[in-house]
């Protein structure tokens, strides 16, 4: 079992990653993975894309066929086009409904596994110290603030540790992003200089 310190830290890492990547990006990726599974929804999605290609192809053929000169051929294409389009719209409507249900389930699972878990930990472990502070190292008021609201005095509370983890992860991510931008800038600056030396 992970200690409370690491559990809270990993919950905040997960929250940060979800917020950084974006919920809609995660939803789209999970929907694409779900469509790879052998389910009826995946079968409907494949059928939908096949019908879409067929509708586009028939529409192209109708546009290339003169409705006055080749009316019989054009009318036959039109009937096939209308039938395929109706099938496509029916499957598309069912697929849209299934995607909405899937998105709802993913949003609930995502909330429960990140923010919901964070709130649960705050209430369940509100009187539990995350770790104890060395005796006499901090003034009484600082010990009280670090144990706020319900942890024993002389320890760090779950609420304070939550704030520390969230802030530390955000700061470390900013530092990492700045270092990455700087390294890319240096690499880009070296590339033109190296090309200039080769041409000389």
UniProtKB/Swiss-Prot annotation:
Residues 42-99 form a coiled coil. One of its GO terms (cellular component) is GET complex. It comes from Aspergillus clavatus (strain ATCC 1007 / CBS 513.65 / DSM 816 / NCTC 3887 / NRRL 1 / QM 1276 / 107). Keywords: Coiled coil, Endoplasmic reticulum, Membrane, Transmembrane, Transmembrane helix, Transport. The keyword Coiled coil applies. Pfam families: CHD5. Interacts with get3. InterPro entries: Get1 (IPR028945), Get1_fungi (IPR027538), Helix_hairpin_bin_sf (IPR029012). It is a multi-pass membrane protein. One of its GO terms (molecular function) is protein-membrane adaptor activity. Required for the post-translational delivery of tail-anchored (TA) proteins to the endoplasmic reticulum. Acts as a membrane receptor for soluble get3, which recognizes and selectively binds the transmembrane domain of TA proteins in the cytosol. Residues 25-110, 173-200 are cytoplasmic. Residues 1-4, 132-155 are lumenal. This is Protein get1. The chain crosses the membrane at residues 5-24, 111-131, 156-172. GO terms for biological process: tail-anchored membrane protein insertion into ER membrane. Belongs to the WRB/GET1 family. It is found in: Endoplasmic reticulum membrane.
